[in-house]
Amino acid sequence: MAEERNFRKVRRGYVVSDKMDKTITVELEQRSTHPLYGKVVRSTSKVKAHDEHNDAHIGDLVSIMETRPLSKTKRWRLESIIERAK
């Protein structure tokens, strides 16, 4: 009997670095509302993602998906390029 994979996280973010071979750095932005004052607070985090064919470049809006650990810091892979940088 084949087991189904668990739900994998999918995130959207902008590529901020593509200097490495087959690796991109993606900046993810989370927005949350302050519980008391109601101000929208932005927080960002950077993750490294696997880009097999070196398709993505700086400024591209990409979709990344969680995957098994590929190296010491890589746990995401490029799913698709949503919008190219102008």
From Swiss-Prot:
Pfam families documented for this protein: Ribosomal_S17
Highest taxon in the source lineage: Bacteria
UniProt GO cellular component terms: cytosolic small ribosomal subunit
Alphabetic keyword roster: Ribonucleoprotein, Ribosomal protein, RNA-binding, rRNA-binding
UniProt GO MF annotations: rRNA binding; structural constituent of ribosome
SUPFAM superfamilies listed in its UniProt record: Nucleic acid-binding proteins (SSF50249)
Entry keyword annotation includes Electron transport: no
Keyword Lipoprotein: no
PROSITE patterns: RIBOSOMAL_S17
GO biological-process terms attached to the record: translation
NCBIfam families: PRK05610.1, uS17_bact
Family: Belongs to the universal ribosomal protein uS17 family.
Subunit architecture: Part of the 30S ribosomal subunit.
Known role: One of the primary rRNA binding proteins, it binds specifically to the 5'-end of 16S ribosomal RNA.
Stated name of the protein: Small ribosomal subunit protein uS17
Organism name: Bifidobacterium longum (strain NCC 2705)
